A protein has these predicted regions:
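Self-splicing inteins and homing endonuclease
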Residues: 1-31, 76-107, 121-122, 145-149
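Short, small-residue-enriched loops and turns at beta-alpha junctions
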Residues: 5, 58-60, 133-134
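Acidic/polar loop patches that form or flank catalytic/metal-binding clefts of enzymes
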Residues: 5-7, 50-53, 127
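Proline/glycine-anchored alpha-helix kink/cap motifs
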Residues: 31-51, 65-81, 106-125, 140-149
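A short, acidic, flexible beta-alpha connecting loop/helix-capping segment that sits on the rim
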Residues: 121, 131-135
Length: 149
């Protein structure tokens, strides 16, 4: 639905553009809450309004991921908001972006990984405490570098 086909091969994963992504994404993420941060950031970067429900567990993860996402995306100019402590939504509304945003990770590995692709759109973006990824993916930054070569 985001315009990408994922194929698993012996060497890894191949991502292929398949066409135009959806113009709006609605998803119940109650069974996949750990994907929420990546989906939220990706949708903002792709200018795809969204409404993600089932996110009640995000408030009790490594950090309050709902508040963290809203705070950091506002720095980038995306007016994301929440409802009922379990819904994240964005209607495409923008807000003033910081000129040199520093993305906080809140000691949360998924925050660092979710915001990593933002650096492709905003070269020079700084993600504070980027080493927090070692909790789940110690070679994350090295693997990302290999993809970008």
């Amino acid at each position: 639905r985001l315009g990408v086909h994922t194929e698993y091969t012996e060497r890894g994963v191949r991502l292929t553009l398949t066409g135009t992504p959806v113009t709006r994404l609605e998803e119940d993420m109650v069974d996949i809450p750990d994907l929420a941060q990546t989906f939220v950031v990706t949708c903002c970067l792709m200018n795809i309004p969204f409404r993600f429900t089932g996110l009640q567990s995000l408030k009790i993860k490594e950090t309050d991921r709902i508040t963290a996402l809203i705070t950091e995306l506002h720095k980038l100019g995306y007016a994301v908001r929440s409802e009922q402590d379990s819904i994240l939504l964005w209607n495409g509304e923008r807000c003033p972006a910081e000129s040199a945003p520093l993305i906080a990770t809140y000691e949360d590995h998924r925050m660092a990984m979710a915001f990593a692709p933002v650096g492709l759109k905003l070269p020079g973006l700084v993600i504070r405490n980027a080493g927090v990824v070692t909790k789940s993916f110690p070679t994350f930054w090295g693997q990302l570098d290999k993809l970008l070569i």
